[in-house]
């Protein structure tokens, strides 16, 4: 494998892809991000590339780190992760002439290559499954709705509910960072309502752990007294099939997404004349033991 210096001399490229994130997001402590990063690093290595990470911290803005990274010419392309709906990064990189690809989507007006999953279709299918089982009081524990994946999941949930003529109860809609502890407090509030949900739909398995704890404190059992579905990123540390009971999920591998994002980025560098890649993956709905009909039924 040629050295970075030899590659730069021969091609004008460094053989390195970059990922930049702000310190306050604490991405390195996030299992979903680290699984995505692992996929990126593995596939980049297979293809003879390296991945470099940079963090915006202290008084240095995220934009300043992007500008410095482009100016120093240490990476050939940047991978944008956790995009916001109104995200300034695509327009910034487009103006700087830096190739990039987004894991997810934004509403940016500049041409954006991306890889995403069908979040709307996935959560519509999960919600329809619960409705078909007889559930009408369904809670959604969503991610941060400043991000496109979360708004798509909410749209899919609403689409399924309204398609069956069921009113969406705003009391049963939650959004926040997808942490177990946050979901525990959300589920505790929901299950204490005078008319609590009979089913909950979560945006991550981490949230499902919080729901299970809140239900257990009320003497309720998932899969018997209450139904639960979560999105499964196929994390090595959290397996839906090892959940007790085994967890019904919408399923798509975040590690595989990391691998594919790297492939698409390198393809863009090698063949810049090709149309920008825009991929949307379908999501599997895997039914297991956590989705009974409503207890009263």
Listing of model-derived features with the role each one plays in the protein:
Residues 3-14:
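Short helix-loop hinge/linker segments at domain boundaries
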Residues 12, 16-128, 132, 190-192, ...:
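Alpha-helical recognition/docking segments in bacterial nutrient-uptake
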Residues 16, 99, 137, 198-199:
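Residues that mark the start of a beta-strand
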Residues 18-20, 79, 139, 201, ...:
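Short, well-ordered beta-strand segments
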Residues 23-35, 53-62, 115-125, 141-186, ...:
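Hinge/beta->alpha junction and helix N-cap segments in small-molecule ligand-binding domains
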Residues 136-137, 168-172, 222-228:
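Short acidic capping loops at alpha-helix termini that bridge into adjacent secondary structure
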Residues 188-189, 193-297:
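Flexible loop/turn connectors
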